[in-house]
Amino acid sequence: MLKSTVSNTRIKCCRIDQRRNYLFTALASSALGSFLWSKNNVLASKMENGELHYHDPNLTFNKKLFNGKPPFERRAPDYPGHVPLYNFEKVLMFLGSSMGAFFHPEENKYIVALGESTAITPILQHLRHKMLSDPVGRTILREKPRMTSDSLNLTYLRSLPDNTIGKNYVNWLDKENVSPDTRVPVRYIDNEELAYIYQRYRECHDFYHAITGLPIIIEGEIAVKVFEFANIGIPMSGLGALFAPLRLKPSQRQRLREIYYPWAIKNGLFSKPLINVYWEKILEKDVNEFRQEMGIQQPPDLRNMRKEYFAKKKLEKQLQGRK
């Protein structure tokens, strides 16, 4: 009887201990869960309120590398229509346009892109210095005139005497079927003033043709480019003189080598800077007087030389056929 009572007492004590252990475990789990949950809530609240800052070890490096800007973000343009390019983009444009200009010289888009990709800043700065050193050049940079059919008033130029610069210019335009309105705006040259200097060079190109009498056929273009390069120093003109003749016939290369290259180099080097000519203000001037003042001699008529050459070849074939 006594043993049975003791045994029952032990069983009850064990059950009480188990209940206590279970209760303590439940309380401990609840307390721990409440602590963790509370901590997570605090972290979540800080994140939501922007109070929690995560330190990114790459952040400092990225800021130094990109100066706080996303990679390859194009900077703001320097003037309306300007497209700023990275150096690698300029290299790619030069490579693509040079290949296009060589195989398709009739495509103006390649010539335009090649010209702007090779018009490097030191060359344009040298031209700016040359213009600033001349009273007329300074006036051009200050007034920044643009050449169009309206600004030049082609109708008025056709009414001028035959010996004037304006009449020679408009006659050349009509003969070659070209227009000053075809000169596209500069887009890829940095700095607004340097871009204008290149735009001025581009728009004056037809005047160089007019005062020399050279046509826009490939030989005439090459001769004018050599003349420009010797006088103004634009790199594309030199590249054209170097590579364009590779696609010509032997007879064409011979004419350039023996007649037009010597003329272009001599007259380009020893004449006054063409970049400082304010063409719009001398349209009524005698063209021969202007050539004399500038130190420019006219080359032989290229179209006549070609006609004489083809007539000679035709005669030779006829004589060979009779034999």
UniProtKB/Swiss-Prot annotation:
Belongs to the COQ4 family. Pathway: Cofactor biosynthesis; ubiquinone biosynthesis. Its main location: mitochondrion. One of its GO terms (cellular component) is extrinsic component of mitochondrial inner membrane. Component of a multi-subunit COQ enzyme complex, composed of at least COQ3, COQ4, COQ5, COQ6, COQ7 and COQ9. Its EC number is 4.1.1.130. It catalyses: a 4-hydroxy-3-methoxy-5-(all-trans-polyprenyl)benzoate + H(+) = a 2-methoxy-6-(all-trans-polyprenyl)phenol + CO2. InterPro entries: Coq4, Coq4_euk. This is Ubiquinone biosynthesis protein COQ4, mitochondrial. Keywords: Lyase, Membrane, Metal-binding, Mitochondrion, Mitochondrion inner membrane, Transit peptide, Ubiquinone biosynthesis, Zinc. GO terms for biological process: ubiquinone biosynthetic process. It is found in: Mitochondrion inner membrane. Residues 1-29 form a transit peptide. Its cofactor is Zn(2+). Zn(2+) binds at residues 205-206, 209, 221. Lyase that catalyzes the C1-decarboxylation of 4-hydroxy-3-methoxy-5-(all-trans-polyprenyl)benzoic acid into 2-methoxy-6-(all-trans-polyprenyl)phenol during ubiquinone biosynthesis. Signal peptide: none annotated. It is a peripheral membrane protein.
